[in-house]
Amino acid sequence: MNASTPLLLAALGILVAERSGVLNLGVEGIMLMAAIAGYMATVETGSFAVGFIAAVAVGILFALFFAIFAVGLRANQQASGLGVAIFGGGLSAYIGIPYQGAVLPERAADGIPFLDQIPFLGQAFFSQHWIVYLSLLMIPAVWYFLFRTRPGLVVRAVGESPFSANALGYSVPMIRCATLAFSGACIGLSGAYLSLIYTPLWVEGMIAGRGWIALALVTFGTWRPFRVFLGAYLFGGMTMLQMNLQSIGISVPTQFISMAPYAATIIVLALISRNPTWIRLN
């Protein structure tokens, strides 16, 4: 669950933005900036809450920075996203130099009181950080918003036919900026979780390609929240399996684990493209 949570959070944010017709390839850079922002804020203030708020704010800020070019100026989305990824990676490395080796304050024990004492199940399911449970609650929430509410219908309409949505009086740029802001908040929370809870430390490039994996997961899950959840936990489970195998002396090449999400995405796209029913459903 720990390894899957950052992937799931980022992927759900990306999914909503892509449903509105925006592809943000800057996820890796935004996650890095959010990770260092959360780490800096926590070290300086001694409060994890302030750290998470700072990370979410930076995630939204960088997502809207991308929106200026991709939505406002109608620049090429792929080029703009790659620019944000490179910029975020370089800037985070520079401003994070003084914080390498910095010590975080002690935090309260994770888990749900009493339930985390249940044998086996308690440690597996009820001893996690609250962000893990938040990410799980977001799955049905995002699904309900997109497929059972009028604003969600508008978001999907903007993504599928922006000219028709504009003709009906909806502001396509505003809706896309709103979905990007939500996406930035999710990506920011994901980055903060990595630097404050999962690791917890700051190292240059610590996101280690998770932003790209989250992008691949959205395609792997065919833009459906529950399928994205399955993909995130599948690849998160593979990461933990690799660590457990290494701990008992079985060596698994890290390159294999790294390439698995992309290979699986290519296979899924190939299968969908060969089946007219799947194309219609997705």
Show where each model-derived region lies.
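Hydrophobic alpha-helical transmembrane segments
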Residues: 29, 33, 49-57, 78-82, ...
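Alpha-helical transmembrane segments within multi-pass membrane transporters and channels
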Residues: 46-91, 239
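Cytosolic-side transmembrane-helix boundaries in multi-pass membrane proteins
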Residues: 141-142, 160-174, 244-282
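Transmembrane helix-bundle core of multi-pass membrane transporters
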Residues: 89-148, 248-257, 281
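Hydrophobic core segments of alpha-helical transmembrane domains in multi-pass membrane transport
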Residues: 10-11, 35-39, 89-93, 134-144, ...
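Membrane-interfacial amphipathic/re-entrant helices at transmembrane-helix boundaries
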Residues: 1-10, 23, 37, 44-51
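Helix-loop-helix "hairpin" substructures at the membrane interface of multi-pass membrane proteins
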Residues: 124-202, 225-230
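Transmembrane alpha-helical segments in multi-pass inner-membrane proteins
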Residues: 198-262
